[in-house]
Amino acid sequence: MNDDTETWLKALQKAPLAANQRTLAKKLGFSVGKTNYILKALIAKGHLKAERFINSNNKRAYRYVLTPSGLQTRIKLAEKFIQRKKEEYEALQRELEELKAKHSQ
C-alpha cells in the first residue's frame, strides 16, 4: 500500500469536503471496495480521520480529513519521490555526457 499512500493522501487533501467513497474511487480509478479498504487502513494508521457531517440529512455521510500525521507522511513521501527523480535525472545526465564524449572522439 505504500505506493498508493501518497496518491491517496494527495487526493484526499484536494478532495471536496463532500467527497464520498464512490467519488474518490472514480477519481482514482479504484473499486469502491478497494477504496473502503484503503480508507480504513489510512484511518488505522492515524493518517486520516472520518468525521460525520453534523448538518447532513444523510447520517452515514462522512468527510475524510488528513491528520497532522497524514500530512507529515505525505510530505515525506513527496520528498522521497523528488529525491528519486533527482537521482534519475543525474544518472541520465551522466549517461548523456558519456555518449557525447564517445561520439566526439
Predicted stretch roles:
Residues 1-7, 20, 53-74:
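Short, cationic-aromatic polyanion-contact patches
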Residues 26, 44:
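Alpha-helical residues within the helix-turn-helix
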Residues 33:
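Key DNA-contact positions within bacterial/archaeal DNA-binding proteins
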Residues 73-105:
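Amphipathic alpha-helical dimerization/coiled-coil segments
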